[in-house]
């Protein structure tokens, strides 16, 4: 029986995979944007089974994102290994909606182990996003980066530059040189350099990260070029198959196994259609990526010193696995009862977990969140969240909360962005009665999707959120036995990369526990458990 890789290998919001092999181990780094901690790090020994082993950016001294908007923050990390050290480049993008100019400070961090600790960041320029480092055989290191903006042209992507990097001094040296201006596909970004035999191979992403996304390859016998483009470029794209199961394919890089086989990592999206009879954002009628961009692998081979994808340009779901021993990992538990001193599979917005707003010790066995800003804020939000990784899933929690005013609220959220979310909240009405209500914000329009459900003086409620591909449905229970739907089925497509007119939508949907108290008193809520089950 032939063993296969099942794509996507990293499900849910895990874009821009950068892959590297170290001995018998494979590692992938993925983007995290405004979510903290920054840069997810994944590990495999067979390219089939993957596990999350940690994050690179865990301190605000490494990553300060306070005040950042949706889809700003950490763009496209590039992971390499040289001199017994892991090197990781990234951009912390500010003001991505700035047109001709963005603030895109880029950095490199290092670690002896993939699990860290990772160093403080070293600046490597502000040219654009998606920096990477290349380690040449002679010991020299080079920084590659895309250029953004600054010219009166319709395409703000100004090509790929390269500059030598002095690792001992921790600084760029010499002048940057443009080594590749891109092809007619446009939007040239994500440069990474590979050396094989007599050639340097520059691999870039082109076409933008929507349906025309693609992987471009060019080569040169000299590191500074000139670079010639692959004769059958692009080598990987979904653009020719509008309804490909893995759409948006691009942003790739190559890795060689210890047995001499080659694979390309790349991002992709699994789109769903609009619900029947419902039209939302007509320009995206070919589908919505509610899970965000994910990561996949394709088998590659070489011909005439050029890489090709073994199954053709369009990515496939089932891929022939390498000739390596299988190495599965233990499955993550579906339920977190908050007994351990740390949270599992959890992300927060823009800042790390802090005792000033979150505690696992003040009431052992419960997660205590202290209310701060509301969901629309770009600053202090008391939220812990988990990626949706399947189109059909159920999330459940038990909440204890004692609100006295409408300005104190806690509950369960389906979250894509500060202006793209649904929220089942427990709060109090103007009479001081405790109530449940489903609210939300879709593209800056606030909505109330249910009437108040008065629950008297109850301070405990069970909440459930079901994702059924195109719909979210909330329900509640006061005893954990009898459940009642609250509000209508809510369209899931607004909570997607294609769910709004803003082109800067690069993350994915999350299930989140959230508490707000805009009185400033930080009223707390206690959560007994958090359960996530896929169907």
Curated annotation (Swiss-Prot):
E.C. number(s) listed in UniProt: 3.2.1.72
Top enzyme class: hydrolase
Gene Ontology BP terms: carbohydrate metabolic process
Keyword Hydrolase: yes
GO MF annotations, alphabetized: xylan 1,3-beta-xylosidase activity
pH dependence: Optimum pH is 7.0.
Reaction(s) catalysed by this chain's protein: Hydrolysis of successive xylose residues from the non-reducing termini of (1->3)-beta-D-xylans
Superkingdom of origin organism: Bacteria
Disulfide bonds: none
Key word Hydrolase present: yes
Thermal properties of activity per the entry: Optimum temperature is 35 degrees Celsius.
Site (Important for catalytic activity, responsible for pKa modulation of the active site Glu and correct orientation of both the proton donor and substrate): 130
Family annotation (InterPro entries): ConA-like_dom_sf (IPR013320), GH43_C2 (IPR041542), Glyco_hydro_43 (IPR006710), Glyco_hydro_beta-prop_sf (IPR023296), Glycosyl_Hydrlase_43 (IPR051795)
Active site feature: 16, 189
Regulation of activity: Inhibited by Ag(+), Cu(2+), Hg(2+), Mn(2+), Pb(2+), Zn(2+) and p-chloromercuric benzoic acid.
Keywords, sorted A to Z: Glycosidase, Hydrolase
A Pfam family matched in the record: Glyco_hydro_43
Function: Beta-1,3-xylosidase that hydrolyzes beta-1,3-xylooligosaccharides to D-xylose.
Family designation: Belongs to the glycosyl hydrolase 43 family.
Name listed for the protein in its UniProt record: Xylan 1,3-beta-xylosidase
Organism per entry: Vibrio sp
């Amino acid at each position: 029986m032939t063993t296969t890789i099942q794509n996507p290998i990293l499900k849910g919001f895990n874009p821009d995979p950068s892959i590297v092999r170290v001995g018998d181990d494979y590692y992938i780094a993925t983007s995290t944007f405004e979510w903290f901690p920054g840069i997810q790090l994944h590990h495999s020994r067979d390219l089939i089974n993957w596990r999350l082993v940690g994050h690179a950016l865990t301190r605000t001294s490494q990553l300060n994102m306070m005040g950042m908007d949706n889809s700003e923050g950490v763009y496209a990390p590039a992971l390499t290994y040289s001199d017994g050290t892991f090197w990781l480049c990234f951009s912390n993008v500010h003001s991505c909606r700035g047109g001709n100019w963005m603030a895109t400070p880029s950095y490199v961090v290092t670690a002896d182990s993939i699990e860290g600790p990772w160093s403080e960041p070293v600046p490597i320029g502000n040219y654009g996003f998606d920096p990477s480092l290349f380690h040449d055989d002679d010991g020299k290191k080079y920084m590659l980066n895309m250029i953004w903006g600054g010219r009166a042209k319709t395409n703000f992507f100004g090509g790929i530059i390269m500059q030598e990097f002095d690792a001992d001094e921790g600084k760029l040296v010499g002048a940057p040189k443009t080594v590749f201006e891109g092809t007619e596909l446009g939007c040239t970004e994500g440069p990474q350099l590979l050396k094989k035999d007599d050639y340097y191979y520059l691999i870039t992403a082109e076409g933008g990260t929507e349906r025309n996304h693609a992987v471009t390859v060019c080569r040169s016998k000299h590191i500074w070029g000139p670079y010639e483009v692959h004769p059958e470029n692009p080598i990987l794209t979904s653009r020719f198959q509008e309804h490909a199961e893995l759409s948006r394919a691009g942003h790739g890089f190559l890795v060689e196994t210890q047995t001499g086989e080659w694979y390309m990592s790349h991002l992709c999206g699994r789109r769903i259609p609009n619900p029947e009879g419902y039209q939302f954002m007509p320009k995206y009628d070919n589908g919505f990526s509610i899970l965000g961009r994910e990561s996949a692998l394709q088998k590659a081979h070489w011909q005439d010193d050029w890489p090709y994808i073994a199954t053709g340009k369009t990515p496939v779901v089932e891929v022939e696995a390498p000739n390596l021993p299988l190495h599965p990992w233990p499955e993550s538990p579906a339920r977190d009862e908050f007994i351990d001193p740390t949270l599992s599979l959890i992300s927060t917005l823009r800042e790390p977990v802090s005792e000033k707003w979150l505690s696992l010790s003040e009431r052992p066995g419960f997660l205590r969140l202290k209310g701060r800003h509301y969901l629309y804020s770009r600053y202090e939000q008391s939220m812990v969240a988990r990626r949706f990784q399947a189109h059909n899933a159920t999330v459940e929690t038990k909440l204890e909360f004692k609100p006295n005013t409408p300005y104190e609220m806690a509950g369960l959220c389906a979250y894509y962005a500060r202006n793209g979310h649904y929220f089942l909240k427990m709060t109090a009405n103007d009479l001081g009665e405790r109530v449940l209500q489903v609210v939300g914000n879709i593209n800056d329009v606030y909505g109330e999707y249910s009437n108040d459900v008065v629950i008297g003086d109850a301070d405990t409620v069970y909440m459930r959120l079901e994702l059924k591909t195109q719909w979210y449905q909330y329900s509640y229970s006061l005893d954990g036995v009898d459940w009642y739907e609250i509000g209508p089925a809510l369209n899931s497509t607004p909570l997607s990369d294609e769910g709004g007119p803003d082109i800067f939508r690069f993350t994915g949907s999350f299930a989140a526990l959230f508490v707000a108290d805009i009185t400033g008193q930080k009223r707390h809520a206690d959560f007994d458990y958090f359960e996530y089950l896929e169907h």
